[in-house]
From Swiss-Prot:
Entry's Gene Ontology molecular function annotations: 5'-flap endonuclease activity; crossover junction DNA endonuclease activity; zinc ion binding
Purpose: Catalytic subunit of the SLX1-SLX4 structure-specific endonuclease that resolves DNA secondary structures generated during DNA repair and recombination. Has endonuclease activity towards branched DNA substrates, introducing single-strand cuts in duplex DNA close to junctions with ss-DNA.
Gene designation per UniProt: SLX1
Zn finger intervals (SLX1-type): 216-283
Entry-linked InterPro entries: GIY-YIG_endonuc, GIY-YIG_endonuc_sf, Slx1, SLX1_C, SLX1_endonuclease, Znf_RING/FYVE/PHD
Protein name: Structure-specific endonuclease subunit SLX1
UniProt superkingdom: Eukaryota
Length: 301
């Protein structure tokens, strides 16, 4: 899986990100990309193609990628999140009474930028996407968990990089460049892991589907991707796998949807239009509905 838009319009990877200037620590930039490694290199002038004009300001380079939000089901969804994060004073994804930033030009502190991120993750439109926040810097992690505006919630999935960087060792050019190189390496490892995990899951699912007829664990319908591939007129059934590597659960996607929706109704008293998560009927681990759907779309394309 590369960094381009995948089949069925589903991106292999897409994230929104927060950059911070290494020499000017109070300068930030918010953007989005299907490839954070390439984009960070563009921002730092290591690649000349691809724009990144707004991060060319005098004295701000190099930049570090401080935080990312990934798991978007489409480029459009990521761009909507990016725009809302950049314009928190007017976005429809934050209620007027909940706004932390109330006017243009406000919200410049790191506390406010991360608080806006949390507010967006609270909105139902983004909440069902099961987005993942990744933090690359120790001080950014401290600000996140300090939670100045008390917006932390159990449904927000945040990953802390084990090798997160501390502050640059000095203000001289050598220290700044070394810090930028270490940050780029962290982003490379993160991006590589993300693509590898999805690629390995999809490879295993395709291998199982190549065996031919498979029976839905819920309705017992027979699904045969080999047979469907030979028929130009037949649309493939959307299917669901458990992404626990030791679980062999398989069903129609619609059947698992009914299970997740029913379980969520029991927990909340409301019937969800789109469930956020649910337990695998076979191994009982918690599964992200958005992730299951994304894999299903790739497999059927």
């Amino acid at each position: 899986m590369g960094d381009d838009i995948g089949t069925a319009g589903v991106p292999a990877f897409y994230c929104c990100y927060l950059l911070r200037s290494i020499p000017k620590r109070l300068s930030y930039y918010i953007g989005s990309t299907p490839n954070p490694v390439r984009r960070l290199r563009q921002h730092n002038g290591l690649l000349t193609k691809g724009g990144a004009y707004r991060t060319k300001r005098q004295g701000t380079r190099p930049w570090e990628l401080a935080a990312s939000v990934s798991g978007f089901p489409s480029k459009i969804a990521a761009l909507q999140f990016e725009h809302a994060w950049q314009h928190p004073y007017q976005t429809r994804f934050i209620k007027s009474e909940d706004r932390i930033v109330k006017k243009k030009g406000g919200g410049r502190s790191i506390h406010q930028r991360l608080a806006v991120l949390k507010l967006l993750l609270h909105h139902p439109f983004f909440k069902v996407m099961s987005l993942v926040v990744h933090l690359f810097s120790e001080d950014i992690q401290r600000v996140w968990f300090l939670d100045k505006y008390k917006l932390e919630a159990p449904f927000i999935h945040v990953e802390v990089d084990e090798d997160a960087l501390s502050e640059p060792t000095g203000e001289d050019e050598e220290s700044v460049i070394e810090h930028a190189k270490k940050n780029l390496r962290l982003v490379e490892l993160f991006y590589g892991r993300s693509l590898k995990e999805d690629s390995e899951c999809l490879e295993e699912y395709r291998r199982r589907l190549q065996n031919g007829a498979m029976r839905c664990a819920i309705c017992e319908k027979i699904v045969d991707y080999v047979k469907d591939s030979d028929s130009f007129s037949s649309e493939k059934e959307l299917v669901a796998f458990c992404y626990n590597s030791v679980c062999d659960y398989f069903s129609c996607l619609s059947c698992l949807y009914n299970v997740f929706a029913s379980d969520e109704e029991l927990r909340t008293g409301e019937i969800p239009l789109i469930p956020t998560s649910g337990q695998c009927p076979n191994c009982n681990i918690e599964l992200s509905w958005a992730r299951i759907v994304r894999y299903s779309m790739f497999l059927s394309a």
